[in-house]
């Protein structure tokens, strides 16, 4: 072996200690290529035609020292994570221009580099856009002084609320409705304000909604997107399994949240894909119970629905299990029914079929399953039979948001669709609610259950609970009972 001189050792040490070696380029993503973003923008050009433009707002900057998260659709089209950014797509010449704020040197010194108008050459290399300009030039470009001669007649912009974190569009729309009905608030949405500004400043444009087109694009996931969702699902599943291991009577709901969060951050998540739902006993009856303040009781079930925000994508996995590690007879009857229903739904998912066809075929199978079955109480029998008519077992798309944009119900399924299968039953008189949730990927030949590795069979669930979890290794100040 050749002798390594002290000079080479010193040179290597200086190299690994240098900022260029030690730090990754945190200011730009590494999952998608220039061609990925260009292909997405090309679909918009194709759709809007040559007598229209599209303007897409990025997310606003955040107050305080908070990690910025771009709005989903802006990230989808550019990969840029700078606040107050705008993208102009000119259908006349199929050119794309990014408008960015000027550099804030003081903030960069304190927080690290953020792409700005001064980085125009770098941004073009990273994103593949044709031009990068400072934000103040957007108005001049919209009146036709430079990019648009003569001015385009139609301006497309997203009018649906953009997701920027743990909230999905359905939740944002509900929040907007509550704000609008508040006589002391009533503020319009950011999208509505933007539309109003365009109307007042540039009345020559007919404004149309770009959201439906973006929704249809995001509905069908590329192979790269699928791999990120797969990783998000793996992290979600490992987090739930860690919570299973940490479960015993006396453990608090929030402690299961902590166990899962540790796994999330350990594996590169930047936060929650949505607020965790962790409910023991009757708390599980509330579909989006988020308080997580109660101790788990012996004899109860605990439901956990949780997934991370991983590289701008998430997942949606739910499991329910016995706090004491063993299903009792009544719990077992209902739980086995739900698992069988999940399997029946997956059996019929494939390209070309609709959600209603899947639901009808699975319900027919479950009616056969129920022949000769008896349950501990008549109310249980009634619940499972009535549940066969419920259409919500086939749920929602999953992707950049947990309740992602696009439609999977009422349309033929296509390869690349990712959505949840979520069989559930309610026993009202006991406030007993049981469900599990898995992530389905439609493939060319059928379907893949992306969360199949997360224990759902009774013996697998009970075996996992017996294993030691984080709470047993790191006992919290509010120490739970020992296993």
Where are these regions (language model features)?
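Bacterial N-terminal signal peptides
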Residues: 9-18
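Bacterial N-terminal signal peptides that target proteins for export
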Residues: 1-9
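Active-site neighborhoods and metal-handling regions in enzymes and metal-associated proteins
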Residues: 2, 20-483
